[in-house]
Amino acid sequence: MLVPPEMIAVQSKTVFQINKYYAEKVQLRMGNIARVIREICKIVQEVLREVEVQEPRFISSLVECNGRFEGIEVVTPNFFEVVLYLNQMGVFNFVDDGSLPGAAVLKLSDGRKRSMSLWVEFITASGYLSARKIRSRFHTLVAQAVEKCPYREMVKLVPDTTEVKLKIRERYIVQITPAFKCTGIWPRSAAHWPIPHIPWPHPALVAEVKSEGFDLLSKESVILQGKNANIEGDAWILHFTEAENRLLQGGYRKRCLSILKTLCDRHLDLPGAPITYYHLKTLLLYECEKHPREAEWDANCIGDRLNGIFLQMISCLQNRRCPHYFLPSLDLFKGKSPTALDNASKHVWKLCREILTSTKAFDRL
């Protein structure tokens, strides 16, 4: 099909503008965040080293590899999450019966004695490994470690929460979350994935993602509120970061996410935090299904993909529902106020309209 020259000219301008935006704004943001991560990780590593001295079951999985830290996730430019992997989940069965969308429990295997578990004192009378009890013990250890840490003048434990959150230099919050890595298994609640007859992701990539597995996190969550208090304390949150990152390899997918995060920081940091990086990542995965061919993820198409994601976001905000990519029964807008969602919808539409109607939009964004 012949494309009119004026359309090619518009597309070339858009590609140029997006590349310029990436070089000037996105890479600046990434550089600033990398600098902050290096600064805070030195302090967090020191705290976790002291924790490990007191309690060898809690081993730091925050490691530096080729100049980058693995095991830390950027939630916002000032809020980070470090996942601390625990050892020896083996004597427990993973129970994912759908009664707690987005969560699961770990139950002592039939015939296994409590004494066979490394985590014996955290097992409830019903045989569940309690996420809350492990977190409570870890909280105590971190509080003691902060007092002994050489950086104690610049790090404090955030009070009035069961979660372990460190405030560093009065500016950055780092949440440290105990977790189990579940490799070689896939949750029943995500068994429908991938949807049949959609060419993306390729079966080889699906097999890779499923063998990589998922994580179980010990953290407070809006998805558990209002449930049985005991179950809420024992339950672990399903977490698919590794799987999601694996799916976003190839083409301009990760670059697209970096641009979305930069636009979010600059234009969608709104009251009530209705839009997070995770919402954007989720909608990017849905956009990958809608546009399965690799040719649809090159430099020439990135403007269309950004618009597609923002239009999806407007629809989700107006319907007040954003389904999790792997667990669609889980609404990622749960707990967000309708007013905040309505306000966000207007801001996203303004941003989307700007990108759609002006080839110079990225100069102003």
UniProtKB/Swiss-Prot annotation:
Gene3D superfamilies: 1.10.1410.40, 3.30.460.90
Pfam family name, one: Mab-21_C
InterPro entries, per the entry: Mab-21-like_nuc_Trfase, Mab-21_HhH/H2TH-like, MAB21L/cGLR
Membrane-crossing segments per the record: none
Family designation: Belongs to the mab-21 family.
Protein name: Protein mab-21-like
Organism listed in the record: Aedes aegypti
